Amino acid sequence: MSWQAYVDEHLMCEIEGHHLASAAILGHDGTVWAQSADFPQFKPEEITGIMKDFDEPGHLAPTGMFVAAAKYMVIQGEPGAVIRGKKGAGGITIKKTGQALVVGIYDEPMTPGQCNMVVERLGDYLLKQGL
């Protein structure tokens, strides 16, 4: 299965009548492996900050997480594995695998839990595949 198929079929899938606003699979260096049409472009320093938070959980909490210059308040995640952020009525979930970052961005009416489920399910699958 291509990386684009993972995005199209597993991240942008319908969950209880709702979809993520955008999604992508990135390399740890920020290289885009596949993305949805509306996925924002990360800046290199944003990827650096995200990767540092995986290595040093809590790094982003004081300043927030920036994605394409949009600021997200970092909320409870799983240290070293998942970063979650909130911005207004929407948010973001980032799951780290051995080689990739699985990213989902949502807006209402999708819930944080639905976003977490979609992103983390694919991330867990990729981890089991050694990716």
Swiss-Prot record:
Residue positions where Phosphothreonine is found in the record: T111
Relay the record's extra comment. Answer: The variability of the residues taking part of IgE-binding epitopes might be responsible of the difference in cross-reactivity among olive pollen cultivars, and between distantly related pollen species, leading to a variable range of allergy reactions among atopic patients.
Short sequence motif named Involved in PIP2 interaction, residue ranges: 81-97
Keyword Transcription assigned to the entry: answer is no
Please tell me the species this chain comes from. Answer: Phleum pratense (Common timothy)
Please give the function described in this protein's UniProt entry: Binds to actin and affects the structure of the cytoskeleton. At high concentrations, profilin prevents the polymerization of actin, whereas it enhances it at low concentrations.
GO CC aspect terms: cell cortex; cytoskeleton
Among the GO molecular function terms of this UniProt record, one is: actin monomer binding
The organism's superkingdom is given as Eukaryota
Kindly give the SMART domains that the UniProt entry links to this protein: PROF (SM00392)
Q: Which family does it belong to?
A: Belongs to the profilin family.
- Disulphide bonds annotated for this chain are C13-C115
**Where does the protein principally reside?**
cytoplasm
Query: What keywords are assigned to this protein?
Result: Actin-binding, Allergen, Cytoplasm, Cytoskeleton, Disulfide bond, Phosphoprotein
Stored InterPro entries: PFN, PFN_euk, PFN_sf, Profilin_CS
Q: Can you name this protein?
A: Profilin-8
Cross-referenced Pfam families: Profilin
Give the matching CDD domains.
PROF
Q: Does the keyword Transport apply?
A: no
Location comes to: Cytoplasm, Cytoskeleton
Q: How does it assemble?
A: Occurs in many kinds of cells as a complex with monomeric actin in a 1:1 ratio.
